[in-house]
Design a protein with these regions (language model features):
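N-terminal low-complexity or amphipathic/hydrophobic leaders
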Residues: 1-22
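Beta-propeller blade signature
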Residues: 1-5, 114-126, 165-192
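Beta-strand initiation motifs
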Residues: 10-16, 73-79, 123-128, 144, ...
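Well-ordered mid-protein domain cores that form the structural environment of catalytic cofactors
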Residues: 17-128
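Active-site-proximal structural scaffolding
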Residues: 87, 110, 137, 176-179
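Conserved beta-propeller blade repeats
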Residues: 92-95, 139-143
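Short, structured patches in soluble enzyme cores that scaffold and shape functional sites
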Residues: 107-110, 119-121, 131-135, 145-148, ...
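Extended catalytic-interface subdomain
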Residues: 141-143, 147-157, 164, 174-176, ...
């Protein structure tokens, strides 16, 4: 569910809350499914964050999809994949480059043994860059940071745990005390070989 307050002339014009109508929400509530593309891990709920990019209001989730487009009144319009260029997980906390307007993303999924760095163009029409940075396990990557020349990939010891998944835990990630945390510095135009940990 998303909540919003529209401010106008120093006053609250309205308060609204709406369900983001992903496939899972449509099924649970008996609503029609939202139009738009689907991919293998777009079964999520788009319930973690709301961001603005390229004039769009987007509801996003960690470790999967979908990316849902919303109206200014918070109604769900459609799921999007940036015109077929997003083929897997997105992120709940991407960052907009204040100079280029591009959206920088650190994505992860429980089946991946890498962190996926994505760039969505300033127009919001395409993923223009994808770099898979191997880490050898399935990390939980909550955030990303950018500088003028680099992206900072945060790899802390919160890892997917198959045993917890098999036990039915909805969030099958665990903190591994004896593993160090790392910050990877990737040049904005670099490859996975250029990451410095």
């Amino acid at each position: 569910q998303v909540h919003g307050v529209r401010l106008r002339d120093g006053r609250a014009d309205w308060y609204r809350n709406r369900y983001v109508v992903s496939d899972r929400v449509a099924e649970a509530t008996g609503r029609p499914t939202t139009p738009g593309p689907r991919f293998h891990d777009s079964e999520g709920t788009a319930n973690t964050n709301v961001i603005g990019h390229a004039g769009m209001t987007l509801a996003v989730v960690e470790a999967g999809g979908p990316v849902m487009s919303l109206t200014d009144d918070l109604d769900t319009v459609e799921s999007i994949d940036f015109n077929g260029t997003l083929d897997g997980s997105f992120s709940a906390h991407p960052k907009v480059d204040p100079i280029t307007g591009e959206l920088h993303v650190a994505a992860y999924h429980w089946t991946w043994d890498f962190i996926r760095y994505l760039v969505v163009n300033a127009e919001g029409t395409a993923v223009t860059r994808k770099v898979d940075v191997p880490v050898g396990y399935s990390p939980m990557v909550h955030d990303i940071h950018i500088t003028e020349s680099s992206v900072l990939l945060l790899d802390f010891p919160c890892r997917f745990n198959l045993e917890r998944a098999m036990e039915g835990h909805q969030l099958p990630y665990v903190w591994v005390d004896d593993e160090p945390g790392s910050v990877g510095v990737l040049p904005l135009d670099g490859t996975s070989d250029d990451v410095r940990w």
